Amino acid sequence: MENKYELEKNITVNAYYYGNVLEMTDTNPISKQSGIRPISKDEYIDLATGMTMKFNHQNKQRIQSPENLRKTFRNLRRLIIANFNAGDIWLTLTYRQDDGRPITDTKRVYRDFKVFWRRFVARYGHCDYLIVLEPQASGSWHLHGLIKKQKGKLPFIDNNLVVEPMWGQGFTMTKRLKDTDNVASYLMAYLTDIPKDEIIPGTSKKGNIKGARLHYYPSGVHIYRGSRGLRRPVKKKGVKSDILFDYGLSRDAKADAAFYHEHKIKNGKKISHITEFYDNVNNKKETNQARQDHD
């Protein structure tokens, strides 16, 4: 199916290569938040109904800017795609609150994970990890972690008998990623959207408010951390056709997917961008080389 949007082949683009995917955009893309529009630190407009609502946040810390968060999550998505596949492990680590007090100290959270990680490596050998903080409306933190063996695959890991005692701080969940898991997209939604009953007291409505969890991330917090062994996306800036050629593709190659983004800036003007994705780059490189050899 032909894409509705396409970058001109002679324009300058920012390109990222990760996990056999080539991503190109004519500028830094900014996703449009369609679920809510904040109008103050305490209120937002539900764009589906037009109603003004109040945030139910007990977390009083200064929030990060949405633009910085979206950039962070785009980088996080690329890291996930570059490093994790079917058979790797996804963990959720939470804190029990026996005294009703939320765990708000991120230094403690990362310190507790460091203790957990030493125990994990002692049992399973050299592994790589990527951990991500998830804020709750109460102000407390959860951790999500992706773990892979540096060589081979991890064996079956029992959540109740192994992971939960190893963590020792509260409820845990352990899942092995499947071929059908789009882990990057799922985790992005999990970390940015929030259930309606968590943010709107007493609501009987089901579902999530898109993007609402972004407003619980305080300024100055490092949202994710990864081990040194993770592969980092390769970033390039140049002419689109030249970058396609550099990765062994035809200068006229068509993207597998392309998306249009529009963003309003302070003076009322709009900035628009197109982002293209080329999947399975290595396979296409071999096909293109074979075609050239035949010619």
Where would I find each of the regions flagged by the language model?
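Right-hand nucleic-acid polymerase module
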Residues: 1-139, 150-295
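Cys/His-coordinated zinc-finger cores
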Residues: 143-147
